């Protein structure tokens, strides 16, 4: 049985960068809808609840064809959003430190160059999707995925271990930023939880 994970902070905690109305809809409506689809799919295919969702979506080709699409979309959506909420924090932002900062400088030249590349990946993702910072073969890379796909999936164009992701579906920013996606991406850096990202990097 899948459940909507708590955010860990109030909906208004990320103001003014991400507004309370967006956070509320995004969590209670959009994320909750994925949970509903997963529970309905698990009723048809009970194996869905036997393993962590990350493990299942990393091997989509092993999922029965009649449930593969909802598992990919809703399983991806549930994993991506759970990961996204933990990537954000009130009074956060700033810049990473320590080993992660060194790895970012080594891979991209500087923190600003990394942000530019990440923002470009988010801004140029056509339609809906996500931009990611991943570890691939021991190195940091920026990638993007369509829809609710992510770099864990065996179907992803660029596979790796996600460290940070940003949702560029319109529902993630439209109420406040309308079609100004680059403005939302610029604001996102003010609420990135670098402690969490560093913790993921240590484990990757």
List where the protein language model places each region.
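Feature for soluble, non-membrane regions of globular proteins
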Residues: 1-204
